[in-house]
C-alpha cells in the first residue's frame, strides 16, 4: 500500500479505480446519505450518485460497489460505517458532535456512528478481490478510510489496511 499527499479528485484520473468512503444508511426517498468528506464531494459532482448508492445498499447491503464509470476511472463505494448502530452506554460509538442527539440503547443512523474497523477491514478485503478479479483495474486510490467524519486515527486504520492492500492501492491524505 502506498501513501500520498494531495487532493483526491486531482489525482483520480491517474488511477483505474477511485473509492469514496460511505456509510450504509439509506433515506426514505431511497438515497444514501453522502453528507461528509469525499462522499459529499462525489455527490456534488454526480447528483444521481446518492440514488445509485442507495439502490446498491438496498439490494446488496453494506458492501463495496461499483457506482459509475467516468472517462478516466471507475468510482466505487468503500463502506466504513453500518446502516445503523445501537448507541453504547457511554455513547463512544457515536461521533462527538451527534452524541447529544441520541440516548444509550437507542438506534442511531449509520452516518452518526464512529467508523467501524471491522467494516473497514471487510471493505479492504472486498476491494482487493475486485482489483484481483478485473484486469482492467491495475491501480486504486482511496482516502484514509474512517479518519475524517469517522473519527478514527490513521494509527488505528493503517494496520488494518496493510493486511489486505498491496502496492496497487494508494491512500491519499489531503
What role is predicted for each listed range?
Residues 1-174:
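Macrodomain-like recognition of ADP-ribose-binding/processing modules
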Amino acid at each position: 500500500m502506498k501513501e500520498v499527499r494531495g487532493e483526491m479528485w486531482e489525482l483520480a484520473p491517474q488511477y483505474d479505480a477511485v473509492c469514496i468512503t460511505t456509510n450504509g444508511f439509506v433515506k426514505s426517498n431511497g438515497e444514501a446519505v453522502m453528507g461528509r468528506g469525499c462522499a459529499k464531494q462525489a455527490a456534488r459532482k454526480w447528483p444521481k450518485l446518492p440514488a445509485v448508492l442507495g439502490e446498491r445498499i438496498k439490494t446488496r447491503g453494506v458492501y463495496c460497489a461499483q457506482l459509475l464509470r467516468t472517462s478516466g476511472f471507475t468510482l466505487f463505494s468503500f463502506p466504513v460505517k453500518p446502516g445503523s448502530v445501537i448507541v453504547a452506554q457511554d455513547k463512544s460509538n457515536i461521533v462527538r458532535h451527534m452524541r447529544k442527539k441520541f440516548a444509550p440503547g437507542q438506534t442511531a443512523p449509520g452516518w452518526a456512528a464512529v467508523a467501524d474497523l471491522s467494516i473497514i477491514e471487510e471493505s479492504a478485503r472486498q476491494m482487493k478481490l475486485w482489483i484481483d478479479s478485473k484486469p482492467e483495474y491495475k491501480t486504486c486510490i482511496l482516502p484514509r478510510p474512517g479518519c475524517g467524519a469517522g473519527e478514527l486515527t490513521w494509527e488505528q486504520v493503517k494496520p488494518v489496511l496493510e493486511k489486505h492492500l498491496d502496492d496497487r492501492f494508494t491512500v491519499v491524505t489531503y
